[in-house]
């Protein structure tokens, strides 16, 4: 659990009256300046999370610890990071559970890696591949700055297009999660290292990428319940009796494709997010396993 008070060396956010966030890494003796307004880091260190602080010139701001979503949007990046709206969906639709063994590629700036680590918990394991040294370095710094030492992360400078290796214990992965330009090239490797009943998930931004990914899943002959979707996030303005959608929204960012590894020879599309029956009118499956005639 984090300390109740802001600590020296911690990365915090200062938030102004318009809701704009400014990232600050606290360092005793330093001075923070914003548009001519100043505040000593010493005046922020040991403040309670959520305190109102006053900069020179009388400018008031909130000093808060960033949420995970805040941190992702403000952290240094090499590769483009996933938006929080997509990061929030991935642990749910990939069914990432405490104790799961997850393979990820590519690491990028580390946002998805952190989301997976938070979901698997200390008893789980995340193995992540990143081919580019500069991206791997940025991701490592971002992860350490936000999460500290993470002993259940195995970060390797490998190219997933060339293959996926199990760890020395030979235990297959429960989940495979890909954020790569050409995930269809990795589908055969994922089929080999994913346990039966395990879940495959990939994120891509365009329709042609989705088409090639789903075609590869079908060709592999061991994936079923395949589903592709996107999510659109729209905030609302609520000011007294004036309630309306905001003029701007985070619309299309990419597509998530999810599939289950199953016994070879069965192919099916997934169910709709609303439930197992398309129109909601079908009777639930019999628990005793008897067929209806």
What are these regions (language model features)?
Residues 129-178, 183:
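S-adenosyl-L-methionine
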Residues 184-255:
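C-terminal substrate-binding/active-site "lid" region of AdoMet-derived donor-dependent transferases
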Residues 97-108:
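Conserved class I S-adenosyl-L-methionine
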Residues 1-65:
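N-terminal auxiliary segments of SAM/dcSAM-dependent transferases
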Residues 118-125, 196, 223:
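Conserved S-adenosyl-L-methionine
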Residues 109-122, 192:
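Conserved SAM-binding loop of SAM-dependent methyltransferases across substrates and taxa
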Residues 3-4, 74-87:
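Conserved SAM-binding loop and adjacent beta-strand
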């Amino acid at each position: 659990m984090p300390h109740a008070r802001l600590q020296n060396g911690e990365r915090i956010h200062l938030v102004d009256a318009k809701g704009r966030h400014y990232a600050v890494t606290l360092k005793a003796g330093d001075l923070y300046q914003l548009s001519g307004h100043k505040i000593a880091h010493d005046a922020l260190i040991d403040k309670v999370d959520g305190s109102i602080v006053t900069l020179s010139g009388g400018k008031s701001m909130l000093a808060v610890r960033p949420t995970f979503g805040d941190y992702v949007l403000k952290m240094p990046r090499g590769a483009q990071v996933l938006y929080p709206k997509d990061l929030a969906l991935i642990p749910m639709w990939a069914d990432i559970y405490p104790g799961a063994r997850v393979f990820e590629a590519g690491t990028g700036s580390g946002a998805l890696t952190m989301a997976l680590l938070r979901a698997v918990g200390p008893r789980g394991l995340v193995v992540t591949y990143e081919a580019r040294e500069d991206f791997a370095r940025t991701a490592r710094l971002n992860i350490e700055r936000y999460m500290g030492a993470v002993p259940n992360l195995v970060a390797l400078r490998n190219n997933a297009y060339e293959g996926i290796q199990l760890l020395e214990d030979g235990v297959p992965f429960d989940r495979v999660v890909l954020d790569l330009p050409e995930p269809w090239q990795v589908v055969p490797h994922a089929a080999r290292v994913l346990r039966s009943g395990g879940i495959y998930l990939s994120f891509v931004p365009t329709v042609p990428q989705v088409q090639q990914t789903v075609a590869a899943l079908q060709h592999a002959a061991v994936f079923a319940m395949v589903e592709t979707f996107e999510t659109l996030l729209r905030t609302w303005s609520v000011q007294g009796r004036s309630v309306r959608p905001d003029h701007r929204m985070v619309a299309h960012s990419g597509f998530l494709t999810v599939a289950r590894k199953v016994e070879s020879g069965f192919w099916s599309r997934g169910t709709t997010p609303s439930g197992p029956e398309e129109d909601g009118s079908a009777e639930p499956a019999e628990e005793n396993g008897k067929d209806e005639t």
